[in-house]
Amino acid sequence: MGLSTNLHSLDLRSTFFTGLRTSPIPSNFIKISSISNPRRDISTIRAQVSTISLETSVKQRQDEIESLFSKQPSQQDSDRKRNGKSSKNGASGISSGVKLENIRKSYKGVTVLKDVTWEVKRGEKVGLVGVNGAGKTTQLRIITGQEEPDSGNVIKAKPNMKVAFLSQEFEVSMSKTVREEFMTAFKEEMEITEKLEKVQKAIEGSVDDLDLMGRLLDEFDLLQRRAQAVNLDSVDAKISKLMPELGFAPEDADRLVASFSGGWQMRMSLGKILLQDPDLLLLDEPTNHLDLDTIEWLEGYLQKQDVPMVIISHDRAFLDQLCTKIVETEMGVSRTFEGNYSQYVISKAEWIETQNAAWEKQQKDIDSTKDLIARLGAGANSGRASTAEKKLEKLQEQELIEKPFQRKQMKIRFPERGTSGRSVVNVKNIDFGFEDKMLFKKANLSIERGEKIAILGPNGCGKSTLLKLIMGLEKPVKGEVILGEHNVLPNYFEQNQAEVLDLDKTVLETVCEAAEDWRSDDIKGLLGRCNFKADMLDRKVSLLSGGEKARLAFCKFMVTPSTLLVLDEPTNHLDIPSKEMLEEAINEYQGTVIAVSHDRYFIKQIVNRVIEVEDGCLEDYAGDYNYYLEKNLDARTKELEREAELEEKAPKVKAKSKMSKAEKEARKKQKMQAFQQAKQKSKASKNSKRWN
């Protein structure tokens, strides 16, 4: 690029420091011991200090200008070689993605991961499953380099792999606007933009030094080519395209992040991840704060991506929809199962059945051989005994088959205090809203004993507010909310339940004080199921993490007597076994249940009636979740599309005679659940005309 061409569009001005050069400063420049005339020497010192300041300023200015220039190719190559030495790359046998090999990790003497081996390649979406505390997030942190394994290898397809990681504790800057927050996803692009501005300012200040100006113009040209290479002009377009897909309106771009709820801030974090176009995508509980519409959008978006993907989620429907294989971590050991979550459940049952049979056969061989040795140990049979001993040695030299670990499913029941009257809740013509938004306008709802209701709707539509109105924590502007007169005893689980725990109490005290007619051992068993080990029972609540407090609040909720359960996102911090425990407890509960949840799998298991919050009204679907899908055309269309996609992924169904025992049990369980849902639907249908 010609010098005159570059100068034409720039506002060039002289600068006062052009031409100045620095001089070395002697180490003995100022000697305090030589001062004889204080006033004269102080003046001298001031002059010297002034000279030092000017020369230092010039030196700093020159350093700043030199820092604007890109490294020479030879230096970049050298850096790349140094970086490459510490990376395990594709030469180790993978062409894309990442592979974990024999990973072991301990914390303070407690082994979390004993033997973890699995890999994810381009086009694969791996679901990591396991109970809370199994080490799933630790594996992601090892992949990103945030943690180092005690032993084993992390093999990456290329040394400078771009890994995007959305952790459970997402970070956003409250002082930025939404657009500025999304811009942080483009780190390289923003660095180029910032450097272009600095180089342009340096050019404007170097008109008296043509050599320097020539170098700066070359750098400016190089940066412009880099900007074109990273498609800098498309940054705004990418953000503008993604924002509405995440649910943001165009006018939201200039709103502060702090003005949005936690759920919307989670969307921003997801958006930044999606904008990075990574080589490997790691997602840790991505659906926790999203409504159903956004979860379905996210599923559709991720399904289209070819990038290797690792997902930690307790959302079984989400895992079903996305995953091509499941990696289970149990007792520190990983096992890989092909297919989605539902296929994993069947495959895991088959594996346990096969492993149990092999272990029993091995034990039978060992026991019979030992018995033979004991019977033939003396006299004329000593030769046969020796042969049997060799057989036993051979059996023991082989790799012994371990008995498969089977976690005991704890069965609990919500304590009930009698039976409520037939009428439980009546919402009559209520109006409610805030200054900038009306949530309900002449809304009506009638709930009777024994109904199990899901409240559905997008984030911000008023689902949680409706629960607060029912509980009397909010008052309607017009209309009234009436609880039934006879023995309606609510037990309320709200999203921020953990925030109201007594921080001075211990874990065990917190649950024991809420419980009635519970044995101490049963309470400890419940706490253990929720991942509170024996050494944590006497720990103060103030010392618990956010997730631990949420699980403790759930345990407290589980032991509180009631006739009405009111649940606001109860599954957010629960692992899959805990969700199954909760589902079973709700199904056996004889009282009334009102639940807000984005977990479709959970909703399908428990409800016999659906209320959808839409445009300030309460739309009533007097049947289970499947009935809601049948009647709601948009929801049904999306569900049919998902079912079709799952059908394509699923293996062909075996003939009944060829099914394993595990598969037969799984299908028997599915039929029983379908039968129970049909009964609930029949019971609910009589209420179809109940509300106006």
Swiss-Prot record:
Name the CDD domains for this protein. Answer: ABCF_EF-3
Where in the numbering of this chain does the ABC transporter domain appear?
A: 98-356, 425-640
Q: Which residues bind ATP?
A: 130-137, 457-464
The record's annotation in Gene3D superfamilies points to:
P-loop containing nucleotide triphosphate hydrolases
Q: Which UniProt keywords apply?
A: ATP-binding, Nucleotide-binding, Repeat, Transport
The biological process GO terms on file are:
response to nematode
InterPro entries in alphabetical order = AAA+_ATPase, ABC_tran_Xtn, ABC_transporter-like_ATP-bd, ABC_transporter-like_CS, ABCF_ATPase, P-loop_NTPase
A Pfam family that this protein carries is ABC_tran_Xtn
Q: Where are the transmembrane segments?
A: none
Keyword Nucleotide-binding present in the record's keywords: the answer is: yes
Bias (Basic residues) occurs at: 680-692
Segments carrying the region annotation (Disordered) are: 64-95, 644-692
**A single GO molecular function, which one?**
ATP binding
Annotated Polar residues bias: 86-95
Q: Where is the signal peptide?
A: none
- PANTHER family reported in the protein's UniProt record: ABC TRANSPORTER ATP-BINDING SUBUNIT, ABC TRANSPORTER DOMAIN-CONTAINING PROTEIN
Query: Which family does the similarity line name?
Result: Belongs to the ABC transporter superfamily. ABCF family. EF3 (TC 3.A.1.121) subfamily.
| The protein, known as | ABC transporter F family member 5
Q: Which organism is it from?
A: Arabidopsis thaliana
